[in-house]
């Protein structure tokens, strides 16, 4: 047996309180469910963000390791050949097909170690090899020089770097000395490549790998220093290197790379979307690339 309840009866104090209580409970449950769904979505979004960030870090490190292995192979060329000529170097780099397989590399080159007293005869010898305008720069008297001798591909941009003595620049010398002393590849910090054009300038860095006399890395640091023959190196334009990696792994993330443990403007090397980058993030994660 049912009993119909009129609106008037519901509005009586007792029934009214029950109705409002039911409505309140329904609203509370709705809010709880809504908040739970927001938290669940946020947690999933944050987890996805962290996964993409870790994948990006791994991809960058793997790419740099591949480039390090390329330099190790390039250094090995000097160990198996008594004399590496300009044509030999060009053929070797052409076979690497860096534009296809190693995006971001501006060029692969070789710097020769030249004692201060030998620089005049060294320049003369290089000019006789087909570079009549070859000069060591910047000018100045130094105990030793490390001018660029080979740099391929032989583009107009790269040819401007012939003769550049990076060892005279502290930013390069720190990395070169570390590579010399350890026998391992070492990267510079943020630099502007000598090949850069004013209207197309971007941040860059170089990776140096030591070349020693003989067919093995000397075991003692003193011998590594005395038997240093030069360096093979790769020059990188950071935007070219990173755009492909970021676009593939995390196209919807704003990514910044700094040459510093502190995020300051002068140390900024790369920003994936500089037009939208600000300091207000939904999620944020900092990682050190090694």
Write out the residue ranges for each language-model feature.
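Extreme N-terminal signal-anchor transmembrane helix of membrane signaling/transducer proteins, especially
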Residues: 3-5, 9-39
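Juxtamembrane membrane-water interface segments immediately C-terminal to a transmembrane helix
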Residues: 36-69, 75, 79-83, 87
């Amino acid at each position: 047996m049912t009993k119909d309840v009129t609106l008037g009866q519901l509005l009586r104090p007792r029934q009214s309180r029950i109705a409002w209580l039911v409505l309140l409970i329904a609203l509370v449950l709705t809010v709880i469910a809504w908040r739970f769904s927001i938290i669940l979505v946020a947690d999933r979004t944050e987890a996805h963000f962290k996964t993409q960030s870790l994948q990006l870090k791994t991809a960058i490190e793997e790419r740099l390791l591949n480039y390090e292995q390329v330099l190790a192979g390039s250094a090995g060329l000097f160990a198996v050949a008594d004399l590496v000529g300009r044509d030999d170097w060009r053929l070797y780099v052409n076979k690497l097909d860096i534009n296809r397989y190693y995006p971001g590399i501006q060029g692969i080159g070789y710097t020769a170690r030249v004692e201060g007293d030998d620089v005049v005869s060294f320049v003369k010898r290089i000019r006789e090899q087909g570079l009549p305008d070859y000069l060591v720069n910047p000018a100045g008297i130094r105990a030793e020089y490390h001018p660029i001798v080979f740099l391929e591909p032989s583009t107009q941009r790269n040819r401007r770097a012939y003769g550049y003595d990076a060892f005279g620049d502290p930013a390069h010398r720190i990395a070169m000395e570390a590579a010399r002393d350890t026998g391992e590849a070492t990267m510079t910090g943020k630099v502007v490549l000598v090949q850069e054009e004013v209207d197309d300038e971007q941040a860059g860095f170089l990776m140096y790998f030591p070349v020693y006399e003989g067919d093995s890395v000397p075991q003692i640091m003193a011998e590594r220093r005395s038997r240093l023959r030069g360096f093979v190196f790769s020059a990188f334009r950071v935007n070219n290197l990173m755009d492909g990696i970021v676009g593939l792994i995390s196209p919807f993330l704003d990514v910044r790379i700094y040459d510093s443990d502190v995020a300051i403007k002068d140390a900024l090397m790369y920003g994936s979307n500089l037009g939208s980058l600000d300091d207000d993030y939904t999620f944020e994660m900092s990682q050190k690339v090694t």
